[in-house]
Amino acid sequence: TVSRLIHAALVTLLMALSFGAYAQDESAVIQTRNEIREATQDALATLYEFQPSARYAIDHAAGYGVFSATGIKLLFAGGRQGRGMVVNNRTHRQTFMRMIGVQAGLGLGIARTRLIFVFETQSALQNFINQGWEFGASGSLAAAAGGEGGMFNGAVSVAPGVFVYQITDTGLAAQITATGTRFFKDDALN
């Protein structure tokens, strides 16, 4: 009958629309993941150019994480947000994550930074992935010299077994300015 044909057509149309929306969302997720992977490779290449010893540190660590962030500062307040991924060197598993931060203090401008975390131990790596992490509200952390040719030369020790390199538009930073920044899993991408 006509009502059954209309019903079947509506069900088919709804299924097609649902599938189209799902496929579009899934393709956007895949595209975002690929953009993060590309940004990760770019950040690592830049780091290795500025600090060749970082390659050894990352290759021999339990894992690493790379985050690209954009910060905006308007007068007395500011913030930054970004995305990245953490890679377990043993399993090669990629976990996609987000970062968000707030900053107080006088300033004006937009800054792009890349943070590269190096996790010496599996427990430090797993804690970062599963529990997230937060830089406190205190001031900047200075990079350790690490000795000539030191494995973590130019990196900042931010927790036991966790070192961070920061790259700005002007090169490898001598301090980490990620205060008030929180890192957590990106449920939409994992």
List the predicted regions and their residue ranges.
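Small-residue-enriched, tightly packed secondary-structure blocks
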Residues: 24-190
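N-terminal signal peptide c-region/cleavage motif recognized by signal peptidases
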Residues: 18-20
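Bacterial N-terminal signal peptides that target proteins for export
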Residues: 1-9
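Short, linear, compositionally biased motifs with a strong N-terminal bias
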Residues: 12-15
